[in-house]
């Protein structure tokens, strides 16, 4: 773990958020995600959780402005409290995907979010993002593929346990890529990130 990321985790004074973030890092390829995020953008992270990625993005580039959007009030309060000394990251307990709220946003992150919303809502969400981003704006998606089967079922069981057996809506990376391109995005980077148990894919798309 690099020193900046370790310092970001150590900002969390409470044991549960800190353990949660360490467990997330064992699964989520945070540094690979951060590597494809523009260093001079105004970034909106939809469903930011405790805000670890956003704090890391803010600390690794002072030219980024990072905005975290999260509906879990407890997580937002913790993220706000531990990031008070950082001028380039803010957290809000609301859905910011609205024209009045996302002015000057030129990069939007969807990190392990899509499979938690229905297929219809996924389509609506992606269409909304396309309409809100300026030409040349960037959408970054990190989610989980439904192949190979053993990784899919492993993650399905994991997410069911974590969410209290909420319904989940996984799509193949190929299908999600086609959905993005159908809206008018151009895929500029795509990778499948190696993990023994999780079928991560990372997609960078630009509005043309």
Protein language model features and the residues they cover:
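Conserved alpha-helix/loop element of class I SAM-dependent methyltransferases that forms part
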Residues: 23-39
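Class I SAM-dependent methyltransferase SAM/SAH-binding core
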Residues: 52, 59-88, 93-97
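A conserved beta-strand element that flanks and buttresses the S-adenosyl-L-methionine
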Residues: 109
């Amino acid at each position: 773990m690099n020193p900046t990321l370790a310092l970001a985790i150590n900002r969390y004074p409470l044991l549960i958020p800190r353990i949660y973030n360490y467990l997330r890092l064992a699964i989520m390829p945070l540094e690979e995600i951060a590597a494809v995020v523009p260093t001079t953008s105004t970034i909106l992270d939809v469903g930011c959780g405790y805000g670890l990625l956003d704090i890391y993005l803010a600390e690794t580039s002072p030219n980024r402005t990072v905005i975290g959007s999260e509906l879990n009030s407890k997580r937002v309060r913790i993220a706000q409290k531990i990031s008070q000394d950082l001028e380039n990251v803010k957290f809000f307990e609301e859905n910011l995907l609205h024209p009045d709220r996302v002015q000057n946003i030129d990069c939007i992150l969807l990190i392990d979010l899509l499979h938690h919303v229905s297929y219809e809502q996924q389509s609506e969400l992606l269409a909304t993002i396309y309409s809100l981003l300026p030409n040349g704006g960037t959408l970054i998606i990190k989610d989980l593929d439904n192949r190979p089967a053993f990784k899919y079922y492993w993650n399905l069981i994991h997410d069911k346990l974590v969410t209290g057996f909420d319904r989940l809506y996984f799509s193949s990376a190929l299908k999600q890529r086609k959905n993005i391109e159908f809206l008018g995005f151009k895929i500029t980077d795509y990778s499948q990130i190696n993990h023994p148990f999780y079928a991560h894919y990372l997609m960078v798309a630009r509005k043309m």
